[in-house]
Amino acid sequence: MDEKQLVSQALSAAIDGVLGVEQIAAIIEKPKSSDLGDLAFPAFQLAKTLRKSPQIIAGEIAEKIDTKGFEKVIAVGPYVNFFLDKNATASEVIREVLAEGEHYGDANIGEGGNVPIDMSAPNIAKPFSIGHLRSTVIGDSIAKIYEKLGYQPIKINHLGDWGKQFGLLITAYKKYGDEATITANPIDELLKLYVKINAEAKEDSEVDEEGRQWFLKMEQGDEEALRIWKWFSDVSLIEFNRIYGKLGVTFDHFMGESFYSDKMDAIVEDLENKNLLHESKGALIVDLEKYNLNPALIKKTDGATLYITRDLATAAYRKKTFNFVKSLYVVGGEQTNHFKQLKAVLKEAGYDWSDDMVHVPFGMVTQGGKKFSTRKGHVVKLEMALDEAVDRAEKQIEAKNPNLENKEEVAKQVGVGAVKFYDLKTDRNNGYDFDLDEMVSFEGETGPYVQYAHARIQSILRKANRKVNIDNISLVVSDAEAWEIVKALKEFPNIVKRAADNYEPSIIAKYAISLAQAFNKYYAHVRILEDDAQLDGRLALISATSIVLKEALRLLGVAAPENM
């Protein structure tokens, strides 16, 4: 039973049901210091009803309450403070973790409901830069968290493969491009063309118009325009898939903006039939004044569609195809207004399922405080950064454990894991500066630090070479270090739920850091392998810790090496 539930039931019985179990659970607090107990109930809530001071009420409850399952229950001023029975709690938690293994913390909250997750979405014909990392790893982690809670996540890569920029790129290719040069080094050469043509289009309106015309041809199904565009797309996907392989990220569907190019007319017609489209300076808009939003521009004066038109078609397609219970968009915070408009247009059109669409924004990655910009050519390729991280990890592993057999494989797990973990430990709405030195460090709040704690436990268990009987676990919790681990293990299922509720993988990452820190304190304080009556209990405790550390890392898409 959950510790809050245990306390709430005992309290409700002690006060003769004046407050229900759920009401009590909602106001239970954690004392600031563990010396004051594990949980505390503020008696202020009962003062008015019982017509007594909170201090007197707390004292009466402490005397009356059934202390089964608790070491002690005491009144501290206006609070009733509960100290859990450490030994019983430890045995129960450890037994549960060892019995359930990687499934500890699983739940069926989602009951198999579909959750499409729009994530990653790099632009074709451009490098896969560090700027694309966040959407990719946050989306992947949320998918794993939701799957653990019984949902059916559907990871969709909504590639940026449609729009006027491709008309401009075709213009550049026709003017300056060479097929053989591009084939030899596709992304770099296409980037050069993209930067060159953007600079020209800013200075020369005729170049900009030519790009617009090529995109219009794409939308109208022009054979030459689509052939060149398809070639750009194919060479880009080869590069992207190689990088996804290094990241260990897979997708259920690659559905770029182009996939919806033949589905937009239906949504525009629907808006027209519902009298939602209004003409403004030759363009078609939806008025969103009642939502305190600017009008949504649905079609330009030349008939070309826009980003929001494609997203309207996308949303309708996903509802029809997946009948989602939630539809998540892991897209940067700068798109917040766009998603407000998108949901408002769908709401106006009578699609109440738009309430189940959630924009999951995130902060920006910078380098040296500067934003990455493909248009200006300021790009740091993610693949190069990952390779550098692996090299740095290998050097550190070489220094720590020169005889490690599978050094290269472990270096990949540590280097790539370090980059992913650093991103995911950052609160989603905050940005961060990309710093490999900090990421790949084995000290501090990093992925390698957590991985090393897991590997150290595995090393101890191999050295012990002893099978622990799950049915006969008895751990005397005589030190604060062991109790901190037990409390952390007990909290893991709630941590997973909280991460899901907030679409926040950093909750898992920070938990993994604190659990690794708790183990390292225990390791420094206790002789784990001492051959005494408590040996099996200690081995069971660290084995359970290893299981939960590994599962926390898995939910972040990070490997847990057995050796480091």
Curated annotation (Swiss-Prot):
EC number of the protein: 6.1.1.19
Main location group: cytoplasm
InterPro entries: Arg-tRNA-ligase, Arg-tRNA-synth_N, Arg-tRNA-synth_N_sf, ArgRS_core, DALR_anticod-bd, Rossmann-like_a/b/a_fold, tRNAsynth_Ia_anticodon-bd
Keyword set, alphabetical order: Aminoacyl-tRNA synthetase, ATP-binding, Cytoplasm, Ligase, Nucleotide-binding, Protein biosynthesis
Molecular function as annotated in GO: arginine-tRNA ligase activity; ATP binding
This protein's GO CC annotations: cytoplasm
A Pfam family of this chain: Arg_tRNA_synt_N
One of the protein's GO biological processes: arginyl-tRNA aminoacylation
Cellular compartment(s): Cytoplasm
Motif 'HIGH' region: positions: 122-132
Chemical reaction(s) catalysed: tRNA(Arg) + L-arginine + ATP = L-arginyl-tRNA(Arg) + AMP + diphosphate
Gene3D superfamilies to which the protein is assigned, alphabetical: Arginyl tRNA synthetase N-terminal domain, HUPs, Isoleucyl-tRNA Synthetase, Domain 1
Enzyme class of the recorded protein, top EC level: ligase
UniProt family annotation: Belongs to the class-I aminoacyl-tRNA synthetase family.
Subunit structure: Monomer.
Listed name of the protein: Arginine--tRNA ligase
Gene that this sequence comes from: argS
